[in-house]
Protein backbone atom coordinates (compact mmCIF):
# COMPACT_ATOMS: atom_id res chain seq x y z
CA UNK A 1 0.00 0.00 0.00
CA UNK A 2 2.84 2.40 0.85
CA UNK A 3 4.48 1.77 -2.52
CA UNK A 4 1.25 2.61 -4.34
CA UNK A 5 0.67 5.79 -2.31
CA UNK A 6 4.20 7.00 -3.04
CA UNK A 7 4.06 6.17 -6.75
CA UNK A 8 0.62 7.79 -7.12
CA UNK A 9 2.33 11.12 -6.38
CA UNK A 10 4.90 10.59 -9.17
CA UNK A 11 4.52 12.04 -12.64
CA UNK A 12 3.89 10.57 -16.07
CA UNK A 13 5.99 11.23 -19.14
CA UNK A 14 9.37 11.16 -20.83
CA UNK A 15 12.35 13.11 -19.44
CA UNK A 16 13.04 16.09 -21.70
CA UNK A 17 15.49 18.74 -20.48
CA UNK A 18 15.20 17.46 -16.91
CA UNK A 19 11.39 17.49 -16.80
CA UNK A 20 8.76 14.80 -17.41
CA UNK A 21 6.81 15.69 -20.55
CA UNK A 22 3.84 13.82 -22.01
CA UNK A 23 4.55 13.00 -25.64
CA UNK A 24 2.49 11.11 -28.21
CA UNK A 25 3.08 9.25 -31.44
CA UNK A 26 6.37 9.81 -33.28
CA UNK A 27 7.62 12.32 -30.67
CA UNK A 28 7.27 9.67 -27.97
CA UNK A 29 8.79 6.95 -30.14
CA UNK A 30 11.83 9.13 -30.94
CA UNK A 31 12.47 10.53 -27.44
CA UNK A 32 11.70 7.61 -25.15
CA UNK A 33 14.22 5.21 -23.62
CA UNK A 34 13.34 2.74 -20.86
CA UNK A 35 14.52 4.11 -17.53
CA UNK A 36 16.75 2.60 -14.91
CA UNK A 37 15.40 2.44 -11.36
CA UNK A 38 17.69 5.32 -10.37
CA UNK A 39 16.48 7.50 -13.28
CA UNK A 40 12.86 6.72 -12.35
CA UNK A 41 13.56 7.86 -8.79
CA UNK A 42 15.46 10.95 -10.00
CA UNK A 43 12.61 12.13 -12.25
CA UNK A 44 9.93 10.82 -9.88
CA UNK A 45 8.07 9.08 -12.67
CA UNK A 46 8.09 7.85 -16.23
CA UNK A 47 5.63 5.89 -18.37
CA UNK A 48 3.89 2.64 -17.43
CA UNK A 49 6.86 0.61 -18.71
CA UNK A 50 9.05 2.37 -16.12
CA UNK A 51 6.50 2.07 -13.32
CA UNK A 52 6.25 -1.69 -13.93
CA UNK A 53 10.05 -2.07 -13.86
CA UNK A 54 10.26 -0.09 -10.62
CA UNK A 55 7.44 -2.04 -8.94
CA UNK A 56 8.96 -5.35 -10.05
CA UNK A 57 12.39 -4.46 -8.65
CA UNK A 58 10.92 -3.04 -5.43
CA UNK A 59 8.85 -6.15 -4.74
CA UNK A 60 11.60 -8.55 -5.82
CA UNK A 61 14.07 -6.84 -3.46
CA UNK A 62 11.61 -7.48 -0.62
CA UNK A 63 11.21 -11.15 -1.55
CA UNK A 64 7.66 -10.77 -2.90
CA UNK A 65 6.89 -12.98 -5.90
CA UNK A 66 5.58 -10.89 -8.82
CA UNK A 67 5.27 -10.81 -12.59
CA UNK A 68 5.19 -8.02 -15.13
CA UNK A 69 2.69 -8.17 -17.96
CA UNK A 70 2.51 -6.34 -21.29
CA UNK A 71 -0.76 -5.68 -23.12
CA UNK A 72 -0.74 -4.48 -26.71
CA UNK A 73 -4.00 -3.61 -28.41
CA UNK A 74 -4.22 -4.26 -32.12
CA UNK A 75 -5.52 -0.77 -32.78
CA UNK A 76 -4.10 1.87 -35.12
CA UNK A 77 -1.86 3.23 -32.33
CA UNK A 78 -0.67 -0.19 -31.05
CA UNK A 79 -1.67 1.05 -27.58
CA UNK A 80 0.18 -0.67 -24.76
CA UNK A 81 0.13 -0.97 -21.00
CA UNK A 82 2.44 -2.76 -18.60
CA UNK A 83 1.52 -3.72 -15.08
CA UNK A 84 2.76 -5.73 -12.12
CA UNK A 85 0.91 -8.46 -10.25
CA UNK A 86 2.24 -9.76 -6.93
CA UNK A 87 1.09 -13.21 -5.87
CA UNK A 88 0.00 -13.86 -2.27
CA UNK A 89 -2.22 -16.60 -0.86
CA UNK A 90 -3.76 -17.58 -4.24
CA UNK A 91 -4.63 -13.95 -4.99
CA UNK A 92 -3.11 -11.54 -7.48
CA UNK A 93 -2.43 -8.07 -6.13
CA UNK A 94 -2.42 -5.53 -8.95
CA UNK A 95 -0.71 -2.25 -8.13
CA UNK A 96 -1.54 0.65 -10.47
CA UNK A 97 0.00 4.11 -10.37
CA UNK A 98 0.79 5.13 -13.96
CA UNK A 99 -2.74 4.67 -15.38
CA UNK A 100 -4.23 7.67 -13.56
CA UNK A 101 -7.84 6.73 -14.30
CA UNK A 102 -7.57 3.54 -12.22
CA UNK A 103 -4.79 4.28 -9.72
CA UNK A 104 -4.94 2.04 -6.68
CA UNK A 105 -4.39 -1.41 -5.27
CA UNK A 106 -6.60 -4.23 -6.55
CA UNK A 107 -6.93 -7.86 -5.55
CA UNK A 108 -8.44 -10.71 -7.54
CA UNK A 109 -8.43 -14.49 -7.55
CA UNK A 110 -8.29 -14.35 -11.36
CA UNK A 111 -5.80 -12.92 -13.85
CA UNK A 112 -8.72 -12.94 -16.32
CA UNK A 113 -10.51 -10.40 -14.10
CA UNK A 114 -7.44 -8.19 -13.65
CA UNK A 115 -6.63 -8.06 -17.37
CA UNK A 116 -10.30 -7.61 -18.35
CA UNK A 117 -10.59 -4.69 -15.91
CA UNK A 118 -7.51 -3.02 -17.39
CA UNK A 119 -8.72 -3.60 -20.97
CA UNK A 120 -12.15 -2.19 -20.15
CA UNK A 121 -10.43 0.99 -18.97
CA UNK A 122 -8.03 1.17 -21.94
CA UNK A 123 -10.64 1.00 -24.71
CA UNK A 124 -14.38 1.04 -25.36
CA UNK A 125 -14.06 -1.80 -27.85
CA UNK A 126 -12.05 -4.74 -26.56
CA UNK A 127 -11.33 -6.87 -29.58
CA UNK A 128 -7.88 -8.08 -30.48
CA UNK A 129 -4.94 -7.79 -28.10
CA UNK A 130 -1.81 -9.60 -27.01
CA UNK A 131 -0.88 -10.33 -23.42
CA UNK A 132 2.66 -11.36 -22.50
CA UNK A 133 4.43 -12.04 -19.25
CA UNK A 134 7.89 -10.57 -19.65
CA UNK A 135 11.21 -10.54 -17.84
CA UNK A 136 12.64 -7.10 -17.34
CA UNK A 137 14.96 -6.03 -20.18
CA UNK A 138 17.89 -3.70 -19.58
CA UNK A 139 17.23 0.02 -19.38
CA UNK A 140 17.96 2.34 -22.31
CA UNK A 141 15.81 0.50 -24.86
CA UNK A 142 13.95 2.48 -27.50
CA UNK A 143 10.18 2.21 -27.85
CA UNK A 144 10.47 -0.30 -30.68
CA UNK A 145 13.15 -2.33 -28.88
CA UNK A 146 11.02 -2.58 -25.74
CA UNK A 147 7.86 -3.54 -27.64
CA UNK A 148 9.77 -6.16 -29.65
CA UNK A 149 11.33 -7.52 -26.45
CA UNK A 150 7.91 -8.01 -24.88
CA UNK A 151 6.30 -9.54 -27.98
CA UNK A 152 9.17 -11.80 -29.04
CA UNK A 153 10.69 -12.74 -25.70
CA UNK A 154 7.60 -12.51 -23.53
CA UNK A 155 5.57 -15.60 -22.67
CA UNK A 156 2.13 -15.53 -24.37
CA UNK A 157 -0.69 -15.56 -21.83
CA UNK A 158 -4.20 -16.44 -22.93
CA UNK A 159 -7.09 -15.11 -20.91
CA UNK A 160 -10.83 -15.12 -21.27
CA UNK A 161 -12.28 -11.61 -21.40
CA UNK A 162 -14.95 -11.29 -18.71
CA UNK A 163 -17.19 -8.47 -17.53
CA UNK A 164 -15.94 -7.18 -14.19
CA UNK A 165 -16.86 -4.89 -11.37
CA UNK A 166 -14.95 -3.68 -8.35
CA UNK A 167 -15.88 -3.92 -4.69
CA UNK A 168 -14.39 -1.23 -2.46
CA UNK A 169 -12.68 -2.87 0.52
CA UNK A 170 -11.26 0.32 2.04
CA UNK A 171 -7.51 0.25 1.35
CA UNK A 172 -7.97 -1.76 -1.84
CA UNK A 173 -10.59 -2.81 -4.38
CA UNK A 174 -11.49 -6.37 -5.27
CA UNK A 175 -12.03 -7.14 -8.96
CA UNK A 176 -14.70 -9.78 -9.50
CA UNK A 177 -16.47 -11.27 -12.50
CA UNK A 178 -20.03 -10.03 -13.01
Please name every model-derived segment:
Residues 1-178:
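A structural boundary/capping signal
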Amino acid sequence: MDLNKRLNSYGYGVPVNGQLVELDGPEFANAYRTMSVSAFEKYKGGVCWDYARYQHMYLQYRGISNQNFYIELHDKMSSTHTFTVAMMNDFGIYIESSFRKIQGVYISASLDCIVSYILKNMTDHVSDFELREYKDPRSGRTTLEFMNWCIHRGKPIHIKYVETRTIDRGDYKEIVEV
